[in-house]
Amino acid sequence: MKRVITYGTYDLLHYGHIELLRRAREMGDYLIVALSTDEFNQIKHKKSYYDYEQRKMMLESIRYVDLVIPEKGWGQKEDDVEKFDVDVFVMGHDWEGEFDFLKDKCEVIYLKRTEGISTTKIKQELYGKDAK
C-alpha cells in the first residue's frame, strides 16, 4: 500500500483544501492528514475559527482522507514519515524546498495551490484586510 501524508490547519474548509486532498490521495492508496492542534496553532500565532475536534470531524468526513492525526509541533514530520511508513510527503508549493530533507526517506512533492481561494482570502473578504 502506498501511503501519502500532508499537513495543515484546514480552518474554514474550502474547495482549495478539497482539491489539495484529492490530488494528494491520487498519489497513493492511503491518505494521512496531520492536522494542527489548537495548541500548535497558538505557537504559530494562528487563530482558527473551528477548534481541533471540529476541524478533525470535517476532515474525517471527506472521502479522500483515510486517517487524521494531530500535528503538535514543527519537528514531528520526520517521525511521522517513519512511524506511518510514508511513501509520499505532500505540501502546497508555498512550502517549496522546506521539506527536502525528507527526500532520503520518501518522495517529497509540492503541489500548486488552487488559484483564487485561500482561508486568508476568505477571512479578509469577510472581516477586512487586517484579518489573517
UniProtKB/Swiss-Prot annotation:
The keyword Nucleotidyltransferase applies. CTP binds at residues 9-10, 14-17, 46, 113-120. Gene3D superfamilies: HUPs. It catalyses: sn-glycerol 3-phosphate + CTP + H(+) = CDP-glycerol + diphosphate. It comes from the Bacteria. Pfam families: CTP_transf_like. GO terms for biological process: cell wall organization; teichoic acid biosynthetic process. It is found in: Cytoplasm. This is Glycerol-3-phosphate cytidylyltransferase. It comes from Staphylococcus aureus (strain NCTC 8325 / PS 47). The gene is tarD.
